[in-house]
Amino acid sequence: MTDPSLGLTVPMAPPLAPLPPRDPNGAGSEWRKPGAVSFADVAVYFSREEWGCLRPAQRALYRDVMRETYGHLGALGVGGSKPALISWVEEKAELWDPAAQDPEVAKCPTEADPDSRNKEEERQREGTGALEKPDPVAAGSPGLKAPQAPFAGLEQLSKARRRSRPRFFAHPPVPRADQRHGCYVCGKSFAWRSTLVEHIYSHRGEKPFHCADCGKGFGHASSLSKHRAIHRGERPHRCPECGRAFMRRTALTSHLRVHTGEKPYRCPQCGRCFGLKTGMAKHQWVHRPGGEGRRGRRPGGLSVTLTPVRGDLDPPVGFQLYPEIFQECG
């Protein structure tokens, strides 16, 4: 549609708001069944001038909001024929084209020239003053609605739509340093109170998380979750070299040293290196007083009398499996 006064092409405006129903008895006031709600009560209608000032993105938002509102009313059981506004939205597909004319580029009627803009501002001020005065017709008819600003209804609907939208990607903010939870035993601080509670269990020796299969207790829920994988037989960590699978990542890390030949654990007494920390711990038994007598032989192969280890402690498990690591280092 072309506006001859401005020489602009104004998009076809949506239909106007329907007139309120009349009382069958002939009364002039608005009549409606008690509790009845119609689409016209919640819809937003624009005049031709107001519609021409909307950007293509705003018109698309208006279309989505109106269709969503109509769908909500249908879900609530509000019947009746399809409103003219919804039919117009579905028919006028060319209005939602992103390449549609932008009113800012073509100058909105309120921005055509300074004189017209000043006149429009005066009319808006006069209209605002008229809205502030009580209207006798509106005062006598509480059901009638006062006219609203062109974009007020659309902004309210868009805000309500954003509030009702589920926030799937919302993450809780990380507390600041002054809001962290500190342990009263060791002073260590944690971001979340639940983590602090589990940490306090380690000081008290409590193990409130028990396995339902074997009854073993754990101080942390994560430890119980890893333990349950043992009963399920899960081995998610697989070696890329040989394909062997492990239940824990730490076990896979230790196994990879077999392929790489890395030996990060060094004996502080003799400097011998080991790939496993347990291997170094077993090796250190040979440096204890009387440790060489456990096997009954010295490194040179000479037979000696067995000598008890200090404290009558037994060597660790695997002593007889790895005898070479318990020999005295030269």
Curated annotation (Swiss-Prot):
UniProt keyword annotation of Phosphoprotein present: no
Phosphoprotein among keywords: no
One MF annotation (Gene Ontology) recorded for this entry: zinc ion binding
A GO BP annotation: regulation of DNA-templated transcription
ZnF start-end (C2H2-type): 181-203, 209-231, 237-259, 265-287
Biased composition (Pro residues): 12-23
Biased composition (Basic and acidic residues): 114-126
InterPro entries assigned to the protein according to its UniProt record, in alphabetical order: KRAB, KRAB_dom_sf, Znf_C2H2_sf, Znf_C2H2_type
Region (Disordered) location: 1-32, 99-150
Alphabetic keyword roster: Metal-binding, Repeat, Zinc, Zinc-finger
Pfam families given in the database record: KRAB, zf-C2H2
Domain KRAB: 37-108
Name this protein carries in UniProt: Zinc finger protein 747
Species whose genome carries this gene: Homo sapiens (Human)
Lineage summary: Eukaryota, Metazoa, Chordata, Craniata, Vertebrata
